[in-house]
Amino acid sequence: MKKVYICSPYRAKDGAELDRNIDYAQQLTRQALEAGLAPITPHLYMTQCMDDKKPEERARGMAAGLALLKGCDFVIAGVKYGITEGMDREIHTAN
């Protein structure tokens, strides 16, 4: 089973946008599973134990996510809602 890193927006200007971004990440993760892939979607679970609004915790979570990215076979970039700063970093790391 190939490992795929799911890259999509997380940060949001309000609660509705955050919910939309989480739903989108979940949809991409489900699609990857249904395609027989092993998805890695760090922003769905890192944010459960780290506060993305605290710069030091965000940096720690991003570093951990980038370490996971390096072990993946490829990346799915969900760009439906644009490319965020974090996504840009992930995409450049993958290349």
PLM regions and their residue ranges:
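Catalytic phosphate/metal-binding cores of nucleic-acid and nucleotide-processing enzymes, i.e., regions
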Residues: 1-95
